[in-house]
From Swiss-Prot:
GO (cellular component) term, any one: host cell membrane
Coiled coil ranges: 68-97
Subcellular location: Host membrane; Virion
Region (Disordered): 30-95, 138-166
Organism: Acanthamoeba polyphaga mimivirus
Disulfide pairings: none
Membrane-topology annotation of the record: Single-pass membrane protein
Residues modified by glycosylation: 27, 47-48, 145, 160, 222
Protein's UniProt name: Uncharacterized protein L309
Sequence intervals crossing the membrane: 4-24
Ranges annotated as biased composition (Polar residues): 36-51
Amino acid sequence: MISNNTITIILVIAIVAIVFYIYFQRNKSRKDSHKNPGNYQNFGTLNNSSDAKIMKKSVKKSTKKKSTKKLLKKSNQNNQQNNQQNNQQNNQQKKVRFDKTVKYNIYKQQSPEISSHNSNNSPFDVDTILNSIYSDQSDISEDSNCSELSEMSELSEESNHSELSDTNNNLCCNIIPSNLEDNTNNYWDSSFGLPLATDEEKNKFAKQIKKNHKNYEKALGNFTKHKTDDNVIIKTDTTIEMFKSPYTSDEDETELQRKPRTVKDIYDNKVAGPKAKPKKIKYKTANMVMYENENEMNGGFIKGTNIHGFDGNAGFKSADICDEF
């Protein structure tokens, strides 16, 4: 049988567990209500509907206040950013000042004779001709008007051609500024804001350019010497020098004139070994042939023996001193 003490202990533990369970459930419901104020299902634990309505209204008011505060902060930040951008744009705007006293170099491809002639004594004035035509319309017919106009145009063309032919040759030399006086060296160049260079400044500039060019040539020469240093290039017996003639005597040069050699011929001449001299028969016997100037390297007898040396043309097995000795 279970004693009374154990029963009381179990009851106390159960009561404490129920109290803790209720406490934690209420804390959870409060946290959920703060996180999700729009979700009103968490208020189902409340018994009275009036309490739930009051809680809903309070949550709505708090959310409205928070949203209005956020909107006010955002609007203030946007206004500050716009003001800063406007200030920067106003500071960065270029302020241009126009000076009416500045004389700009506007050149005309005309000589002064042509310009004065066209302005004052033009040979073909349209206004005067039209006034003369329309003044007496009853007396002058259309045919006569056309004839007079054609005659005047022909005269004007002839005069223009005669005058232009004399001045076309001098157009390149007579480029005259329209708004400047004769002595333009005393004025500032309005397009760049710098005075025109004097003769002394031009000479200094030319000397500086020459000096810089000499320094450039020296630097370039040192660079080429460094790149083509003979100590870097390893020369052997078979090295081909492209800029050196492969012929050493005048006879070789005459051969070059008769028959030019290719790069392959030069390479073969450098790489190939010594050519064997043609063999001359000294005497023949029934068993062998003896040649002049025989030695062991061209198929003759080895000194002090009756053994043939390596011929150089046949394989190694033909030599008596090799595998088949």
